[in-house]
Amino acid sequence: MTLNRKCVVIHNGSHRTVAGFSNVELPQCIIPSSYIKRTDEGGEAEFIFGTYNMIDAAAEKRNGDEVYTLVDSQGLPYNWDALEMQWRYLYDTQLKVSPEELPLVITMPATNGKPDMAILERYYELAFDKLNVPVFQIVIEPLAIALSMGKSSAFVIDIGASGCNVTPIIDGIVVKNAVVRSKFGGDFLDFQVHERLAPLIKEENDMENMADEQKRSTDVWYEASTWIQQFKSTMLQVSEKDLFELERYYKEQADIYAKQQEQLKQMDQQLQYTALTGSPNNPLVQKKNFLFKPLNKTLTLDLKECYQFAEYLFKPQLISDKFSPEDGLGPLMAKSVKKAGASINSMKANTSTNPNGLGTSHINTNVGDNNSTASSSNISPEQVYSLLLTNVIITGSTSLIEGMEQRIIKELSIRFPQYKLTTFANQVMMDRKIQGWLGALTMANLPSWSLGKWYSKEDYETLKRDRKQSQATNATN
């Protein structure tokens, strides 16, 4: 194999799938991580992939059409037959290359435990048995993002569609015990936006705006992929501080202003002149307009309401008492940092590789070796805090909401006031959305094959033989 290799790079995120080649900086395609299943008159099932194909199919509003996802809330595949069809669609329609021709690199989310061996085996089965890929590599997404930015230690905050994932990385190693996540992300905001705007966009005697239980899954997906996305990108904002604190501040300012006006009125009566009148500036009552194109209707909301949507990510208990305040983004980040500091002394034990070879743990198998873990296990928790908080990486599509980076800095500074904070967030919107794929692209372009953990079909066959022998031995015992 030569150093000037070309690989296929596929990133299956919870919302979108990105695919391309390692020798091209931009992906070949970005499609939804879902598909529409349609049954024709003959009873044959048709599977529709691709953004425009799915939008066109959903707009037809055909009875029986349903939208299905490929990955679960953890970002791991569960619909393997559909995943195979999606990859074949990518190879045949978008990449226009045979799977047998090029190596394959894919991403996998970080978890707070050892990767499920069953998940890894299904990946290898799909790659080697069904697609006949020559060699194959799985990279941990937040680790790839950190290394692609030149950071061996980082605190990766990924605010995506299915939720928020917080991953601390020390010396190129994911601190598995400190990986935390919440279910509050872009999809959660989609639902809240729909619930809030439904009464505003519903017209009298409009049969298309009936109760949600009568909507098809294709209708829900279509709305989330069109006008709701536009609403979130243009209307939503994150307040720099707690929204309740902001309201209290402006209320206090209004009270002070009222007292000043009362004093001026008394002076007016004594000095016989008219004081200037006006009102204090309260940005929360300013209006923002959104054009709802399906009905050509303008929707008007207070700025406070625009802040309120994003506030749910930091305080989910505002929606329901059933949601814990600990699942808010602020407590989640603090929990991850503290757990990383507490568990760093046992990291060396957590980074041992699986003797079977294919089931790798969240160790940086792509750079360095286990010698680097010895130094990381000797640092103090305070040093871990400082190392993480000076290398905060903010990524994910939902992190693009205006004001998100400033609010994250505020939340961390409240909980760790004695530490310096440094954040890194890609300011190019598209790059932020596909940063997981860009990280995998970097890992695919390492200068030497030996720096990456590549697996061949022979390795997979060896694993299967060893597993069968182990099962036979256990059965006889």
UniProtKB/Swiss-Prot annotation:
Keywords: Chromatin regulator, Nucleus, Transcription, Transcription regulation. Changing residue 19 to P: Impaired heterodimerization with ARP9. Temperature-sensitive phenotype. Moderate suppressor of Ty phenotype. It is found in: Nucleus. CDD domains: ASKHA_NBD_ScArp7-like (cd10212). The keyword Ubl conjugation does not apply. One of its GO terms (biological process) is chromatin remodeling. GO terms for cellular component: chromatin; NuA4 histone acetyltransferase complex; nucleus; RSC-type complex; SWI/SNF complex. GO terms for molecular function: chromatin binding; structural molecule activity. Gene3D superfamilies: 3.30.420.40, Actin, Chain A, domain 4 (3.90.640.10). Component of the chromatin structure remodeling complex (RSC), which is involved in transcription regulation and nucleosome positioning. RSC is responsible for the transfer of a histone octamer from a nucleosome core particle to naked DNA. The reaction requires ATP and involves an activated RSC-nucleosome intermediate. Remodeling reaction also involves DNA translocation, DNA twist and conformational change. Present with 1360 molecules/cell in log phase SD medium. Forms a heterodimer with ARP9. Interacts with NPL6. Component of the two forms of the RSC complex composed of at least either RSC1 or RSC2, and ARP7, ARP9, LDB7, NPL6, RSC3, RSC30, RSC4, RSC58, RSC6, RSC8, RSC9, SFH1, STH1, HTL1 and probably RTT102. The complexes interact with histone and histone variant components of centromeric chromatin. Component of the SWI/SNF global transcription activator complex. Belongs to the actin family. This is Actin-related protein 7. It comes from Saccharomyces cerevisiae (strain ATCC 204508 / S288c).
